[in-house]
Amino acid sequence: MYSRKINMIILGIESSCDDTSAAVVIDGTAIQSNVISGQEEIHNCFGGVVPELASRSHLSAIQPVVEKALSDAKISLDDIDLIATTQGPGLSGSLLVGYSYAKSLSLVKKIPFVGVDHMAGHALAILLEEETPDFPFIALTASGGTSSIFLVKSSTDFELLGRTRDDAAGEAFDKVAKVLGLPYPGGPHIAAHAETGDEKSIKFPRAWLDKDGFDFSFSGLKTAVLNYHNKIVQKNGSITKEERADICASFQQAVIDVLVTKTINAARTHGISTVVLGGGVSSNRALRLAFSHECDKCKLQFFVPAAKLCTDNAAMIAVAGYHKYLRFGPGNLSDDVYSRSQLG
């Protein structure tokens, strides 16, 4: 256990996919700045993230984003006590930009450095809110790259209970959006169309996999949506606005049913009374409402961060890095990035 400096100032850096972000957080709780530079316009015409374009965009964005985070917090690099950056999982080229930049700052300014697992950031983002859960809790981290359920015993002790076996929830949203001719990223656009659709109109499959397990699979659902869409197009030449809305609503509900059911089952199985939601998919309003309703019905406490802390951001990385540093000390500058999560 490393001694904690009062009012420790952490610089967080995130570049795991297509968002370049830098944040300044004090003591793992107080956000002083949280700057995010997205790449939606770059990738929209491709219907998804192009890794090479993403890494190039990070290269041009990282310096000004960090400078703005420091400026917004009204501090300089000389005031930073710890640098925390995403080490994985994610796109290797994207990860390397933020990770290498953070290590360079650490070497030049002689500031302690720690690499952070992106999923830990999503699970601990709730600690940035005024109302926070007690440990242990069950955390669902649902994003574009992965969907996982963790038993979070402390801020540095995670047990992996279940993960996606193929497409993650966010990835399924993006792929279905592309099929329906909706822009990238798909989640917000599907959610918007779903508001005017009937979630009971189409019986899309729910992949429960093992009855008592907590793994996810959304590739079958994605294929079912593709086949349903193609049948309508083959018959009528195109789909109507109403048909698109019904597809969005029915698809979204199928994802929600699986995420909610498996997460609550994990809490029941392990005797945990608190559920925490994190990751980009958790900004979905229908998912939040479903979790709130089911947790209330099951007498479970439910926590979810503000939407701005659910999508990829450096503030959550700063929080996870702060706690990791206090327990394990500074990271090894010779370590490399990793594409698959090593959490739990």
Curated annotation (Swiss-Prot):
GO CC terms = cytoplasm
As for subcellular location, the record says: Cytoplasm
Q: Name one GO biological process term.
A: tRNA threonylcarbamoyladenosine modification
User: Which reaction(s) does the protein catalyse, per the Swiss-Prot or TrEMBL entry?
Assistant: L-threonylcarbamoyladenylate + adenosine(37) in tRNA = N(6)-L-threonylcarbamoyladenosine(37) in tRNA + AMP + H(+)
List positions binding Fe cation. Answer: H118, H122, D312
The record's remark on the cofactor is: Binds 1 Fe(2+) ion per subunit.
The UniProt record gives the binding positions of substrate as T141, A142, S143, G144, G145, D174, G187, N284
List the Pfam families: TsaD
EC number, UniProt record: 2.3.1.234
Key word tRNA processing present = yes
Q: Name one GO molecular function term.
A: N(6)-L-threonylcarbamoyladenine synthase activity
Q: Which cofactor does it need?
A: Fe(2+)
Alphabetical UniProt keywords: Acyltransferase, Cytoplasm, Iron, Metal-binding, Transferase, tRNA processing
As given in the record, the signal peptide range reads none
Please give the family membership noted in the entry: Belongs to the KAE1 / TsaD family.
Q: Its biological function?
A: Required for the formation of a threonylcarbamoyl group on adenosine at position 37 (t(6)A37) in tRNAs that read codons beginning with adenine. Is involved in the transfer of the threonylcarbamoyl moiety of threonylcarbamoyl-AMP (TC-AMP) to the N6 group of A37, together with TsaE and TsaB. TsaD likely plays a direct catalytic role in this reaction.
In terms of PANTHER family, this protein maps to: TRNA N6-ADENOSINE THREONYLCARBAMOYLTRANSFERASE, TRNA N6-ADENOSINE THREONYLCARBAMOYLTRANSFERASE, MITOCHONDRIAL
This one is known as: tRNA N6-adenosine threonylcarbamoyltransferase
Q: Please report the organism this UniProt entry assigns to the protein.
A: Desulfotalea psychrophila (strain LSv54 / DSM 12343)
Top-level taxonomy: Bacteria, Pseudomonadati, Thermodesulfobacteriota, Desulfobulbia, Desulfobulbales
